[in-house]
């Protein structure tokens, strides 16, 4: 009795299609694949156009569905040329590892993507070696975001259950020193700087780093708005700029600068945070970042504290309160006070 030919049927969430000698563009192919009528929603399509050694183009395609799609028509994924009478029939396979297929069709780089890649359990198969390979690939990524995406696709268990540690570790691995700020005005354009401020700057910036004291003196400058104190403070050299609050995260705070500028940070807030560490130029201390691990601060650099007069803003008014007498005595040993009565410049173009 003759045997019946085996009926074509593939039941899978992930399909791997190969179109040999297919001259269609990636864009035309994607449009036709998106238009296919299926009972299961499509979630992700990735197309790679590759040239054979003989110059003939072919396409690799990964299609991911929301659930399992049962394909019983081997011509279902055929593509049609819009300009001539030609059909392109693919080799159809169930993608056992969507991550492996995605990596494979990425190899030539000429790709087109629609939707969001869906991670599945088989994407992380292979045990320790696969995990190590994925970790190495993540370390070689060009950015934290790219590294996280690699881990999400290839080691989803670690992404799900160890995200907090991953996020913190990748922040350190891909840490970039903040770009140096370029002042719009040179320090020499400030022609009305009080002698106390000028002398403080010369005593610190006029020396090499080796000749500076272990814990240099800071300076607290109080003055009205638009007197130029911020621009002057920021024009002296490489610095950290802390405005309104303290953000000592490594993405914005650098251990490679010469001083800190603390601008419009209320004295009550600074007292609760790191008054003595910052104003006292203390070395090698830690700060706890919200939702992150403690950050090690190298320290040993002075701070220029800028404030306005009046209750709530003035450091003098704050320290003159009886309950702050011990802190006042400490601060007088670690910082100079300067009170501005006029702008630091002559031109009306500079203000802060």
UniProtKB/Swiss-Prot annotation:
One Pfam family matching this protein: Gemini_AL1
Cofactor needs: Mg(2+); Mn(2+)
Chain positions of motif RCR-2: 58-60
Binding locations of a divalent metal cation: 50, 58, 60, 108
Chain sites annotated for binding ATP: 223-230
Impact upon substituting residue 148 to M: No loss of interaction with RBR. No effect on oligomerization
Molecular-function GO term, any one: DNA binding
Domain CRESS-DNA virus Rep endonuclease: 9-117
Protein name: Replication-associated protein
Keywords, alphabetical: ATP-binding, Covalent protein-DNA linkage, DNA replication, DNA-binding, Endonuclease, Helicase, Host nucleus, Host-virus interaction, Hydrolase, Metal-binding, Multifunctional enzyme, Nuclease, Nucleotide-binding, Nucleotidyltransferase, Transferase
UniProt-listed GO biological process terms: DNA replication; rolling circle single-stranded viral DNA replication
PROSITE patterns, per database record: CRESS_DNA_REP
Phenotype for residue 145 to A: 14% loss of interaction with RBR. No effect on oligomerization
Family listed: Belongs to the geminiviridae Rep protein family.
Species name: Tomato golden mosaic virus (strain Yellow vein)
Motif extent (RCR-3): 104-107
Compartments reported by the entry: Host nucleus
Span list, region Binding to RBR1: 144-154
């Amino acid at each position: 009795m003759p045997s019946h030919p085996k009926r074509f049927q593939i039941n899978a969430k992930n399909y791997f299609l190969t179109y040999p000698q297919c001259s269609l563009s990636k864009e035309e192919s994607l449009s036709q694949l998106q238009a296919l009528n299926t009972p299961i929603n499509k979630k992700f399509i990735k197309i790679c156009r590759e040239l054979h050694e003989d110059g003939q183009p072919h396409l690799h395609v990964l299609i991911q569905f929301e659930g399992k799609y049962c394909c019983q028509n081997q011509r279902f994924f055929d593509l049609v040329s819009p300009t001539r009478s030609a059909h392109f029939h693919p080799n159809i396979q169930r993608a056992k590892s969507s991550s492996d297929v995605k990596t494979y069709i990425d190899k030539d780089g000429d790709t087109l993507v629609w939707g969001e890649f869906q991670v599945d359990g088989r994407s992380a198969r292979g045990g320790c070696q696969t995990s190590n390979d994925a970790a190495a690939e993540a370390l070689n990524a060009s950015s934290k975001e790219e590294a996280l995406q690699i881990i999400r696709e290839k080691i989803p268990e670690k992404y799900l259950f160890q995200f907090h540690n991953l996020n913190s570790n990748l922040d350190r691995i891909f840490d970039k020193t903040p770009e140096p700020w370029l002042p719009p005005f040179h320090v020499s354009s400030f022609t009305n700087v009080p002698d106390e401020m000028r002398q403080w700057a010369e005593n610190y910036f006029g020396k090499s780093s080796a000749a500076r004291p272990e814990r240099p003196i800071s300076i607290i400058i109080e003055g009205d708005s638009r007197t130029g104190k911020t621009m002057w403070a920021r024009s002296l050299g490489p610095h950290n700029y802390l405005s309104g609050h303290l953000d000592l995260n490594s993405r914005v705070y650098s251990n490679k600068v010469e001083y800190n500028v603390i601008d419009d940070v209320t004295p009550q807030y600074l007292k609760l945070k790191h008054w003595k560490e910052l104003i006292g130029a203390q070395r090698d201390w830690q700060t706890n970042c919200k939702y992150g691990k403690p950050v090690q601060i190298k320290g040993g650099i002075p701070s220029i504290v800028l404030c306005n007069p009046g209750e709530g803003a003035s450091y003098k008014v704050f320290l003159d309160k009886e309950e702050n007498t011990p802190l006042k005595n400490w601060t007088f040993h670690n910082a100079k006070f300067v009170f501005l009565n006029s702008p630091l410049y002559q031109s009306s173009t500079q203000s802060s």
